[in-house]
Amino acid sequence: MVDTVGIVGLGLIGGSLARRLTERGVRVVAWNHRQHPYAQAEADGIFCKSTLSELMDAEPDVVVLCNPLKAMPAILAALAPLMGDHPNTTLTDVGSVKGMVRDQVKAAGLGKCYVGAHPMAGNELSGWQAADPHLYDGALWAITVDESTDYRRFLDVAAMITKDVGNRVIVVDDETHDKAAAMISHMPHVVSTALINELVANPDRNIAAALAAGCWRDMTRVSLTDPDRTRAMVEEDSLNVEALLRRMAARLTDMADQLHAGAAGEQDVMGFFAEGDPFRRYKAAVTHAGITAAQDDTATAAPQAGTTAAGFPERELAVPEAGWQQTLLFSARRGEAITGFVHPRQAIVQLRPAM
């Protein structure tokens, strides 16, 4: 049961989370390295603290680190002596790279109380002024665990996400998460930025920009993100992003060669566009099943398997004491997501289309 949540960092992600939790009846205490958001945050019902020590004195059940990853070592060093006086508090974060954060958490001596998390929510904006509780509407979170993750602490974070935030959860290990995040988030930011860089370098850029419509808008939205934020995100997952960019460059070079070959490369060109058919079928199934419909954000005191408001079937999943991490990882690989718990060892999982 999560009664109080501590938020460290009131930017876009942390501020939106704090506002959403507060709106849903959770007591939220927060600390930000600059206090300029405090007046508005307190008007929204968030209890702002001057120091991390004051935040911990509020006895939060879960502390969520929403600070930039470059600030993580300093924040962890400041929290380490405070967490020792609050052994029941669980530590989590919202960073988009998990392996590096876990290493930093362990280096600070906080590994035993840590459970990684990453909400797949966000936009091209930043700062408290962009904070919006609806940012988390229908969001999926990745919770990252390893062999030493304490199950009780995992439940703290999972309950906060499913019950208090009203979102879904999958459970993965750090390496799997970081490779997947590079594929669906970090690498696309680079590709999107390359597109606008190509436009800027084009002598007819003003004509091209005037002709741009839906395709260009959709493919370049994330390029509008603060460049410093994008650079940091990409560099923090650099090995995975580098590997993907090299594979992407090879694909594009092959396509250029096939187009250069003219009629001789026609079959290869068709093969290029047909290769993604499994994803097209997946997206069609997702849309048909209703994943694009608004998620049911109404928490229930006693969840049970059935059919969600969005139209997805659900089932119960037993979570064993031994090997629970692998059980939940296999569930994620089947395309399932946790929506709640009947009791601590019985999860409710949503059955989603899979490729």
Predicted features and spans:
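NAD(P)+-binding Rossmann beta1-loop-alpha1 motif at the extreme N-terminus of oxidoreductases
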Residues: 1-54, 62
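Residues at the starts of beta-strands that form the adenosine-phosphate
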Residues: 4, 27, 88, 113, ...
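Rossmann-like NAD(P)-binding element
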Residues: 54-86, 90
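Glycine-rich, N-terminal phosphate-binding loop of Rossmann-like dinucleotide-binding domains
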Residues: 66-68, 95, 145
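Rossmann-like NAD(P)(H) cofactor-binding subdomain of soluble oxidoreductases
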Residues: 75-129
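Internal alpha-helical scaffold of NAD(P)-dependent oxidoreductase catalytic cores
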Residues: 135-224
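Interdomain hinge/lid region at the active-site interface
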Residues: 207-281
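Long, low-complexity C-terminal extensions of enzymes
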Residues: 250, 258, 262, 267-355
